[in-house]
């Protein structure tokens, strides 16, 4: 009997699992303010769900009755919106292409004189070398 501890109460065992100190004041205030807010939002969500279900119940027969009109109208609107979006995309593509082309032409126009000078120097060097070679050949022909 001495080896069995009977002096512990069941509440002491439960309290040993609980933390020593309780929640802070800010935690209590957060729960007190957020709990009613959550309840109000849950009620609003339920009301919106109820309204949606009632609206579908009322509108479904109207959709069925007017579907020969609504389906082609919806398709027409969808195609028109798709056309406008595609037109806008093509317009943006055209503007960006023209912008790239203008920038390319400006860059080429700025570097064109440099390229012409480089080509002129190469032609002059080639002509000068050919002239020297022709002079050498003529001197070789003159001196037998």
From Swiss-Prot:
Membrane association type: Multi-pass membrane protein
Biological-process GO terms, alphabetical: lipid droplet organization; lipid storage; response to freezing; seed maturation; seed oilbody biogenesis
Record's GO cellular component terms: membrane; monolayer-surrounded lipid storage body
Expression sites (tissue/organ): Expressed in seeds (at protein level).
InterPro entries according to UniProt: Oleosin
Residue numbers spanned by region Disordered: 124-144
Sequence motif Proline-knot, location on chain: 61-72
Transmembrane intervals: 28-48, 53-73, 75-95
Compartment(s) where it occurs, according to its Swiss-Prot or TrEMBL record: Lipid droplet; Membrane
Keywords linked to the UniProt accession: Acetylation, Lipid droplet, Membrane, Transmembrane, Transmembrane helix
N-acetylalanine found at: 2
Family designation: Belongs to the oleosin family.
Domain remark in the UniProt entry: The proline-knot motif may be involved in the targeting to oil bodies.
PANTHER family on file: OLEOSIN, OLEOSIN 20.3 KDA
Function, as annotated: May have a structural role to stabilize the lipid body during desiccation of the seed by preventing coalescence of the oil. Probably interacts with both lipid and phospholipid moieties of lipid bodies. May also provide recognition signals for specific lipase anchorage in lipolysis during seedling growth.
Protein name: Oleosin H2
């Amino acid at each position: 009997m001495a080896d069995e501890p009977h002096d512990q109460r069941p509440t002491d065992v439960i309290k040993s699992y609980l933390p020593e100190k309780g929640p802070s004041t800010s935690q209590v205030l957060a729960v007190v303010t957020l709990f009613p807010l959550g309840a109000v939002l849950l009620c609003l969500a339920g009301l919106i769900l109820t309204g949606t279900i009632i609206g579908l119940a009322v509108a479904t027969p109207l959709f069925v009755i007017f579907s020969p009109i609504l389906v082609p109208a919806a398709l027409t609107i969808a195609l028109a919106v798709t056309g406008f979006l595609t037109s806008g995309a093509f317009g943006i593509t055209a503007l960006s292409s023209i912008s790239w082309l203008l920038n390319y032409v400006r860059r080429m126009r700025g570097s064109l004189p440099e390229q012409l000078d480089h080509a002129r120097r190469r032609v002059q060097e080639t002509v000068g070398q050919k002239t020297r070679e022709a002079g050498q050949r003529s001197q070789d022909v003159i001196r037998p």
